Structure formats: structure tokens, C-alpha cells
Amino acid sequence: MTRQSTYSRDQLLASARGELFAPDSGRLPNDPMLMFDRITEISDAGGTHGKGLIRAELDIRPDLWFFGCHFIGDPVMPGCLGLDAMWQLTGFFLTWIGAPGRGRALGCGEVKFTGQVLPSARLVRYEVDVSRVINRKLVMAQTDARMLVDGREIYTAKDLRVGMFTSTENF
């Protein structure tokens, strides 16, 4: 498939099945672990570091799977799912630029949670800025990201790292 600058939910689910890019390329997780509904912008230029950016959105509905179990009587989106979305987007960026292999989260520097996503929210927006791409034996991207709910920043993460591996046997 030709690189695009936006992707619909159906296209993202095709990525999970290995149908969007080359069959042996990186994949997004399938439902329910896919943590965004669309990519509204992706570019290998721009962003705060001038090395690329990814913008994505998740529509919040009270019936989302995690609200029913986290927590009963006090529903809130787990913070780790927002963080995972940032890793998912970083891995998608690597696949989108043509990096071979399967993506794996390698860590991050600093993470801050200053708010929460409740069932009454409408929209989560992710803004991921690529700060570094290493293209050697290991292909890796490093990004800085933030997550906004209804326009208010609630999570930030610095130095998110995702690597691409042609074999994950000994990972």
C-alpha cells in the first residue's frame, strides 16, 4: 500500500491483520487493544523535533471495555492504555517509513499523569513527535508524546522507544 497521511479505523484494523503494509511488516494490535480510532496526520517531517509526527484520536464511549472492569463503581481508563497507545503509534510510524520487522516497546524516560479519562469524556487525542530514528542493525524510534482528553493535556511521556525486530525469539 502507498503511504498515506491519514488512516481510518478499518485501515488500522487491516494493519492488525497484516493487510495494510507488507505481510511481514509491523502490525498494530487488534481490538480491544488498539487504542485509537484513526490517525489524523502522520509525516516523516515536522513535529517539535522536525523528524516526524503522528496525530491520532480515540472516541470515548461509556461502553468501552475497560470502563466495565477498571474500576467497578469508579470507571476510569487505565493510564497504561494511554501510554501503550503512544508506543503503538511510535511502532506504526516505523512500519510506515518502511522499517522491517515487528515492533516492540523498549521503554521510556519520564511519564506523567495529571488527569483521567472518564466515561463522560468525548475525545482523546494523541500527539506524538519523533525525536530520533536509528536505522542500523536495530531500527528504533524515540518519541515524545502527550495525550489530551477533550482538549486538556493529561498524560505526557518523554523518550518513548520502540524497536523493530526481524526475529523476536530471543527478545
Curated annotation (Swiss-Prot):
Gene3D superfamilies: Hotdog Thioesterase. InterPro entries: FabA, FabA_FabZ, HotDog_dom_sf. One of its GO terms (biological process) is unsaturated fatty acid biosynthetic process. GO terms for cellular component: cytoplasm. Its EC number is 4.2.1.59, 5.3.3.14. Keywords: Cytoplasm, Fatty acid biosynthesis, Fatty acid metabolism, Isomerase, Lipid biosynthesis, Lipid metabolism, Lyase. It catalyses: a (3R)-hydroxyacyl-[ACP] = a (2E)-enoyl-[ACP] + H2O; (3R)-hydroxydecanoyl-[ACP] = (2E)-decenoyl-[ACP] + H2O; (2E)-decenoyl-[ACP] = (3Z)-decenoyl-[ACP]. Pathway: Lipid metabolism; fatty acid biosynthesis. Its main location: cytoplasm. It is found in: Cytoplasm. It holds the Pfam family FabA. Homodimer. This is 3-hydroxydecanoyl-[acyl-carrier-protein] dehydratase. It comes from Xanthomonas euvesicatoria pv. vesicatoria (strain 85-10).
